[in-house]
From Swiss-Prot:
PANTHER family, alphabetized: MICROTUBULE-ASSOCIATED PROTEINS 1A/1B LIGHT CHAIN 3-RELATED
Role, per record: Ubiquitin-like modifier involved in autophagosome formation. With ATG4, mediates the delivery of the autophagosomes to the vacuole via the microtubule cytoskeleton. Required for selective autophagic degradation of the nucleus (nucleophagy) as well as for mitophagy which contributes to regulate mitochondrial quantity and quality by eliminating the mitochondria to a basal level to fulfill cellular energy requirements and preventing excess ROS production. Participates also in membrane fusion events that take place in the early secretory pathway.
One GO biological process term: protein transport
InterPro entries hit by this protein: Atg8-like, Ubiquitin-like_domsf
Gene Ontology CC, one term: autophagosome membrane
Top-rank taxon: Eukaryota
Gene3D superfamilies referenced in this protein's UniProt entry, alphabetically: Phosphatidylinositol 3-kinase Catalytic Subunit, Chain A, domain 1
Family: Belongs to the ATG8 family.
Site (Cleavage): 116-117
Annotated protein name in UniProt: Autophagy-related protein 8
Propeptide: 117
Modifications made to the protein after synthesis: The C-terminal Asn-117 residue is removed by ATG4 to expose Gly-116 at the C-terminus. The c-terminal Gly is then amidated with phosphatidylethanolamine by an activating system similar to that for ubiquitin.
Amino acid sequence: MRSKFKDEHPFEKRKAEAERIRQKYADRIPVICEKVEKSDIATIDKKKYLVPADLTVGQFVYVIRKRIKLSPEKAIFIFVDEVLPPTAALMSSIYEEHKDDDGFLYITYSGENTFGN
């Protein structure tokens, strides 16, 4: 999936911003969170997050649920490189494995358990 954030901001600018964030907040992870295009779930109001390194994927999902005001009975799935990460995994380990060349971790979310084909 194409990232709108990547389309809107040139690589050098993104890279410089991620480096600045990592220097200033060494214990935080710069995350870009965007909705899977064809999903009927609510669009998030904020794409950029600075999450604690020791936050779990499950805790991050909770943050996203609150931001989009998702009711408890509705499902939400997040993807990193088109794969569902383990709920108990730390954001720091997901970041180390999947961070983009620009230094950001790109996460997409959907109301469906499939990666929008």
